[in-house]
Amino acid sequence: MKKKSIKDKEQENNWEEKVVQVKRVTKVVKGGKKLSFRAILIVGNEKGEIGVGIGKASDVIGAVKKGVTDAKKHIINVPLTKSYSIPHPIEGISGAAKVILRPSAIGSGVIAGGSTRTVLELAGVKNILAKQLRSSNTLNNARAVLNALSQLRTFQNTAQNRDINIERLFNM
């Protein structure tokens, strides 16, 4: 079976891209200051696949393009429940940022702020409660959410890890 390239994956899924932040950054060099742009992008298909990427270039368009390719390289799968929530509460950490994610009732919507909200919406999560702690850094908060979502486990995963069937897992 042939390996799927990034272009094949791109055609299969309808990826939605959102630019979370574009910053003007400078680097001091011998001749003065060199100006460039840093773009933070989130790419998702609202079906449980999500990625966060960064792009740096001398112009904004180039930074966004690099950010999209970087985000598509770092895509993770998110297990969603039937109510488009997460299976269990979880915490994620990236740098100084800490994010707490909790499943919520049907119809409650995405209760989150900043880049956390964008990541969760593009992942396809529709009912969740999230809280950002310790840091307001956009990139670290987005990565903390990605860290938390990558740690999520379903009942099937837990049963396989323990080498028992799902019925026994519920009866414990």
From Swiss-Prot:
Assign the protein's first listed, main location to one coarse class.
Answer: plastid
For this UniProt record, the keywords arranged alphabetically read as follows: Chloroplast, Plastid, Ribonucleoprotein, Ribosomal protein, RNA-binding, rRNA-binding
Which terms under GO biological process does the entry name?
translation
- What SUPFAM superfamilies would the database entry show? dsRNA-binding domain-like, Ribosomal protein S5 domain 2-like
**Which compartment or compartments is the protein found in?**
Plastid, Chloroplast
Q: Which residues form the S5 DRBM domain?
A: 15-78
Asked if the Swiss-Prot or TrEMBL record annotates the protein with the keyword Magnesium, the reply is: no
Q: Does the keyword Plastid apply?
A: yes
- Name a GO molecular-function annotation: rRNA binding
Q: Mind telling me which PROSITE patterns this protein's record contains?
A: RIBOSOMAL_S5, S5_DSRBD
Q: Name one GO cellular component term.
A: chloroplast
Q: Which InterPro entries match?
A: Ribosomal_Su5_D2-typ_SF, Ribosomal_uS5, Ribosomal_uS5_bac-type, Ribosomal_uS5_C, Ribosomal_uS5_N, Ribosomal_uS5_N_CS, Ribsml_uS5_D2-typ_fold_subgr
- One Pfam entry name: Ribosomal_S5
Q: What is known of its domains?
A: The N-terminal domain interacts with the head of the 30S subunit; the C-terminal domain interacts with the body and contacts protein S4. The interaction surface between S4 and S5 is involved in control of translational fidelity.
Give a short account of what the protein does: With S4 and S12 plays an important role in translational accuracy.
Q: Which PANTHER family match?
A: MITOCHONDRIAL RIBOSOMAL PROTEIN S5
Which proteins does it associate with, and in what oligomeric form? Part of the 30S ribosomal subunit. Contacts protein S4.
Family listed: Belongs to the universal ribosomal protein uS5 family.
Instruction: List the protein's name.
Output: Small ribosomal subunit protein uS5c
Per the record, the gene is rps5
